[in-house]
């Protein structure tokens, strides 16, 4: 399939609106053209600083604006992070992601996170961080330290965005992605479905991602986990088929990207997850927690992998070079 970054919303909607089985079948065909059919990239996510975030994301338990009963924690010691990274590697993860509840890292935080990147990288793991907004200097220093991926989600469509967050603009997010890309790191960026958005917003999110100059190497598709005390605690649950449609379209229009099952997976049946893999998902977060939300534990994932005949991918150089070459051809 030809790699494109000129998708129109009408084209994406036409894909999204196909009969469900036709869409999933097409996505699986595209998936097999670019990836091993039964291999899943496994990541582990650790919160290195929890709670009291100044942002007002309406879905997030870590926001200081809401009474979610989350107990805030100061940043954890580097040696504790390394211990967790070693355990993640022993459990089959190929990538270790570190997240901090910051609007952006302060300069006083940079030596701490740079040391962390170097130490985790030395274990032979791919490294990823999500620390909020970055300026160009911070992005370059993270890249120089060996950071492979930087996560900064767009969350939802540009049109729906202001219903979800007011303390950071949509363009602020795009600017951070530009800094990450300019510094030579790989981009991890996706969004959340089930925020109370409409179908057009899911299409809009996919359109934003697929029309970036270079597609994100990793695209997390989260399902909202309602958190008591947040404004979205009682939002109507999205039908799982809409989540799978979003995954399938992401696979078709971003064929070289890893499509990751992220938050919300803990509530899904094995059959739902199998259908998501059929729709082109080929990455997931393993472990009992994703920052502060529950997740399918490592033991459950091992059982699921055995049931479906899936194997975990080994750490390797990502497909970024292939995607860049294809887009410049």
UniProtKB/Swiss-Prot annotation:
Query: Which keywords does this Swiss-Prot/TrEMBL entry list?
Result: 2Fe-2S, 4Fe-4S, Biotin biosynthesis, Iron, Iron-sulfur, Metal-binding, S-adenosyl-L-methionine, Transferase
Q: Which GO terms describe its molecular function?
A: 2 iron, 2 sulfur cluster binding; 4 iron, 4 sulfur cluster binding; biotin synthase activity; iron ion binding
Q: Which positions are annotated as binding [2Fe-2S] cluster?
A: 97, 128, 188, 260
Gene3D superfamilies cross-referenced by the UniProt entry:
Aldolase class I (3.20.20.70)
Question: GO terms for biological process?
Answer: biotin biosynthetic process
Pathway the protein contributes to: Cofactor biosynthesis; biotin biosynthesis; biotin from 7,8-diaminononanoate: step 2/2
- Annotated Pfam families: BATS, Radical_SAM
Q: Which CDD domains match?
A: Radical_SAM
- Domain annotation Radical SAM core: ranges: 38-262
EC main class here is transferase
List the catalysed reactions. (4R,5S)-dethiobiotin + (sulfur carrier)-SH + 2 reduced [2Fe-2S]-[ferredoxin] + 2 S-adenosyl-L-methionine = (sulfur carrier)-H + biotin + 2 5'-deoxyadenosine + 2 L-methionine + 2 oxidized [2Fe-2S]-[ferredoxin]
Cofactor dependence: [4Fe-4S] cluster; [2Fe-2S] cluster
Residues that hold [4Fe-4S] cluster according to the record = 53, 57, 60
* Enzyme Commission number, as recorded: 2.8.1.6
Co-factor remark: Binds 1 [4Fe-4S] cluster. The cluster is coordinated with 3 cysteines and an exchangeable S-adenosyl-L-methionine. Binds 1 [2Fe-2S] cluster. The cluster is coordinated with 3 cysteines and 1 arginine.
- The residues that cross the membrane are none
The record's annotation in HAMAP family points to: BioB
Quaternary structure annotation from Swiss-Prot or TrEMBL:
Homodimer.
Family the entry assigns = Belongs to the radical SAM superfamily. Biotin synthase family.
Q: Which PANTHER family did the record assign?
A: BIOTIN SYNTHASE, BIOTIN SYNTHASE, MITOCHONDRIAL
What role does it play?
Catalyzes the conversion of dethiobiotin (DTB) to biotin by the insertion of a sulfur atom into dethiobiotin via a radical-based mechanism.
Please give the name of this protein.
Answer: Biotin synthase
User: What high-level taxonomic lineage is stated for the organism?
Assistant: Bacteria, Pseudomonadati, Pseudomonadota, Gammaproteobacteria, Moraxellales
């Amino acid at each position: 399939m030809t790699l494109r970054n000129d998708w129109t919303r009408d084209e994406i909607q036409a894909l999204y609106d196909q009969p469900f089985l036709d869409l999933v079948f097409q996505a699986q065909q595209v998936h097999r053209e670019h990836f091993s059919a039964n291999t899943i990239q496994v990541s582990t996510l650790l919160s290195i600083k929890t709670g009291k975030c100044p942002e007002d994301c309406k879905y997030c338990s870590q926001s200081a604006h809401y009474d979610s009963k989350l107990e805030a924690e100061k940043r954890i010691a580097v040696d504790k992070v390394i211990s967790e990274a070693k355990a993640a590697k022993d459990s089959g993860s190929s990538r270790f992601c570190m997240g901090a509840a910051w609007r952006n890292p302060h300069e006083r935080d940079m030596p701490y996170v740079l040391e962390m990147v170097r130490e985790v990288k030395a274990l032979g793991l791919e490294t990823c961080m999500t620390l909020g907004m970055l300026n160009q200097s911070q992005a370059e220093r993270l890249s120089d330290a060996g950071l492979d991926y930087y996560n900064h989600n767009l969350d939802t469509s540009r049109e729906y965005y202001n219903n979800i967050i007011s303390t950071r603009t949509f363009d602020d997010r795009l600017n951070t992605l530009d800094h990450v890309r300019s510094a030579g790191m790989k981009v991890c960026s996706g969004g959340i479905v089930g925020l109370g958005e409409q179908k057009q917003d899911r299409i809009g999110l996919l359109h934003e991602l697929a029309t970036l100059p270079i597609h994100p190497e990793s695209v997390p598709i989260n399902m909202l986990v309602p958190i008591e005390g947040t404004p979205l605690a009682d939002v109507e649950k999205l039908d799982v088929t809409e989540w799978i449609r979003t995954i399938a379209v992401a696979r078709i229009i971003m064929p070289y990207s890893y499509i990751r099952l992220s938050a919300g997976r803990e509530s899904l049946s094995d059959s739902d997850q199998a259908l998501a893999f059929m729709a082109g998902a080929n990455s997931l977060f393993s472990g009992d927690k994703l920052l502060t939300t529950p997740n399918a534990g490592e033991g459950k994932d091992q059982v699921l992998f055995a049931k479906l005949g899936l194997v975990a991918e080994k750490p390797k150089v990502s497909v970024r070079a292939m995607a860049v070459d294809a887009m410049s051809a």
